[in-house]
Amino acid sequence: MTLSTGTLGSIASTHTLPSYLDANHLGPWGNYLQQVDRVTPYLGSLARWVETLKRPKRILVVDVPIEMDNGTIAHFEGYRVQHNLSRGPGKGGVRFHQDVTLSEVMALSAWMSIKNAAVNVPYGGAKGGIRVDPKKLSMGELERLTRRYTSEIGIIIGPS
């Protein structure tokens, strides 16, 4: 994000949008933004909410270190995205995959917001991800990874 110098008012009027709002962004998040742009003309009075749909409420990237069965310490990258919490707490699982990206987790959290709203359940949208091949971990390692990831994202999950 680029900001100019000066008063708060001039900063607010001259900043560049965060890169995650760029519909030309490659990957799942960019695809989601393009889909939102494509349906906007059909939203009528609801179109005023489009910018909200394009902005995740919170993005958390965490380092998740765990002790492996052989005694070494391995580090995994984890993500938690809370897309929208206006309908209630964020609902969404965790994707364990070696190729998961922040872009993918952002898109999945946004779709959770839309799915929950479409079926009128009192939840917002959220999603998590951990870059790991779970097939390469023992059950004990997978349990330690899950517990540590949950601990690391604890600052944004749970009762308010």
What residue spans do the PLM features occupy?
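N-terminal ligand-binding/catalytic initiation module
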Residues: 2-160
